[in-house]
Structures are given as structure tokens and as C-alpha cells.
Amino acid sequence: MFDLFEPERRAINQLLVGLRDEIIKKDASVRGFNIGMNSGDAAGQTVDHAHVHLMPRRQGDVPDPRGGVRGVIPAKAAY
């Protein structure tokens, strides 16, 4: 994200908003989203290009949604 030009950042934001609207339209059970992007080796980036994860969330899909996506797969939460 930090290496992108402003028009690219705006395009990503527009894409995320459009995808959000499309997902909610198709699935009314979606109540929120996690948006993820790793930037740099220390942050866990494993591919050498910008990419964004948009994860639809539903009420009660995990016991406690605090902490974001780390708790979605309990066996993988502590890493």
C-alpha cells in the first residue's frame, strides 16, 4: 500500500466499496468485513505485490471477533 500511487490507492478503495455492496446484496447475513494487507517481510508479506483481502463476516461466525481474523480459525490463532 505504501508503494502505490494515489490513483492506485483510490482504485483499491473503490473496488473494496463495490465488492462490499455486491456481497451484501447477495448475502444479507453479512454484517461486517475484515480488510487485510501485509506490507513488508516483518508484517508477513509473502508475495511481492500489493493485494488486499476482503473477508465478509457474520454475527456469531466466531465466539469473539475482537482481534480480527486471527480468531477465525482457532487452531491457527496463536502464531
Segments (PLM) and residue ranges:
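HIT superfamily nucleotide-processing domains
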Residues: 1-79
